[in-house]
């Protein structure tokens, strides 16, 4: 089974520029242990703050954060954030300021959410986990989304988290899940802090 997920990124750049076989080979050859944040890879077309339409969106991207414990346990999270609000959000071009999506909704904005709000992530750890335990970690890690993104987990979101474990470190699954939650939260913040203006969307 090969798991996969995508986010809507067709509003920035050439919407017909689909990845092809050659790009797959180039990506594999360029693989390294360095995680690139900001407008790289899947983060190139990621945006936030679309509650009032794409014209009010801001730029987002990819983010990474790793937590390492003294005993040797490592839990990292790589996130591509394509949603509504965090440190970035709905940008009012007329008022030249960021507007809170939460406050807009409380003020009576009832616009239907688009299908362009998705956050996907991968939790990577050296813990020894079974497939079932990886699923538990992914579930717990979703709380990291809830702690950093508003709104989140709507019916139009394709939010997903995959967990990979290398099996080198024996520890409790709940410990990994707890650390994964915080790693996800901080990776979302990293995605916003390391982005840049692109395609008419300011950072």
Predicted feature descriptions by range:
Residues 1-203:
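A structural signal for small-residue-enriched, beta-sheet-centric alpha/beta enzyme cores
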């Amino acid at each position: 089974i090969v798991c996969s997920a995508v986010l809507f990124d067709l509003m920035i750049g050439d919407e017909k520029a689909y990845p092809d076989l050659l790009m797959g080979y180039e990506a594999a050859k360029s693989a390294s242990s360095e995680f690139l944040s900001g407008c790289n890879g899947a983060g190139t077309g990621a945006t936030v703050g679309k509650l009032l339409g794409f014209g009010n969106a801001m730029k987002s991207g990819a983010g990474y954060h790793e937590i390492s414990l003294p005993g040797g346990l490592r839990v990292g999270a790589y996130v591509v954030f394509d949603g509504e609000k965090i440190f970035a959000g709905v940008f009012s071009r007329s008022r030249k300021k960021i507007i809170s999506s939460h406050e807009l909704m409380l003020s009576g904005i009832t616009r239907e959410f688009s299908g362009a709000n998705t956050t996907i992530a991968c939790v990577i750890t050296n813990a020894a986990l079974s497939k079932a335990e990886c699923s538990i970690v992914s579930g717990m890690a979703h709380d990291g989304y809830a702690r950093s993104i508003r709104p989140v987990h709507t019916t139009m979101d394709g939010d997903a988290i995959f967990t990979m474990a290398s099996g080198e470190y024996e520890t409790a699954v709940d410990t990994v899940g707890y650390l994964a939650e915080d790693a996800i939260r901080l990776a979302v913040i990293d995605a916003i802090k390391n982005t840049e203006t692109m395609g008419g969307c300011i950072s």
